[in-house]
């Protein structure tokens, strides 16, 4: 049983989905996170997501997505999306606390990620530099989303 799932290989009980009034949120359609929000709402409404190890998915990954700049943009985008999903799931009264927690967490990640990137570069350790760059990118996404930004059109259908 899982709390969230990607939608590239998702079978749904449409009767349940319709009974509880769930729909994919189009505001997340081109930015990513639509499947995360939907499946989190599905579980919150009492739905169950099960993993099927035998399911096969073929997902073509263009060579351009194997480059460091794309991967860092993706990390920033995913981090921002996680905050946007939390805000969408929360009631209006909970949003200020979520935004404050996200802003603080984003700032910490930016500082630690920047330091780790610098240290990794100075000592010639690409692993530490890469992990620092990833943490820095995620921090930027979290901080941006905490203030209402961070939206990146991941998928232009």
Model-derived features with residue positions:
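A recurrent flexible, glycine/aromatic-enriched loop bordering the glycosyltransferase active site
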Residues: 1-12, 29-33
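Short, well-ordered alpha-helical scaffold segment located
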Residues: 15-20, 56
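Non-catalytic, C-terminal membrane-associated alpha-helical segments of glycosyltransferases
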Residues: 73-80, 91-157
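Activation segment
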Residues: 20-21, 61
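Nucleotide-sugar-dependent glycosyltransferase catalytic core
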Residues: 27-31, 39, 58-81, 87
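Substrate-positioning beta->alpha
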Residues: 13-16, 34-38
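A residue-level structural signature of the nucleotidyltransferase/glycosyltransferase Rossmann-like core
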Residues: 2, 9, 21, 48-50
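Catalytic donor-sugar/metal-binding loop of nucleotide-sugar-dependent glycosyltransferases
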Residues: 26-28, 36-58
């Amino acid at each position: 049983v899982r709390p969230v799932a990607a939608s590239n290989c998702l079978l749904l009980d449409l009767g349940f989905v319709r009974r509880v009034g769930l729909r994919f949120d189009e505001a997340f359609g081109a930015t990513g996170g639509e499947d995360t929000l939907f499946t989190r709402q599905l579980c919150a409404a009492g739905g169950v997501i099960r993993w099927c190890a035998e399911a096969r998915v073929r997902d073509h990954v263009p060579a351009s997505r194997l480059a460091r700049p794309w991967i860092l943009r993706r990390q920033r985008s995913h981090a921002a999306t996680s905050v946007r999903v939390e805000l969408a799931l929360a009631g209006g009264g909970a949003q200020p606390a979520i935004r404050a927690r996200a802003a603080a967490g984003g700032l910490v990640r930016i500082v630690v990620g920047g330091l780790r990137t610098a240290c990794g570069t100075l000592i010639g350790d690409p692993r530490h530099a890469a992990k620092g760059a990833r943490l820095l990118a995620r921090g930027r996404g979290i901080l941006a989303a905490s203030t209402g930004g961070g939206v990146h059109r991941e998928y232009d259908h």
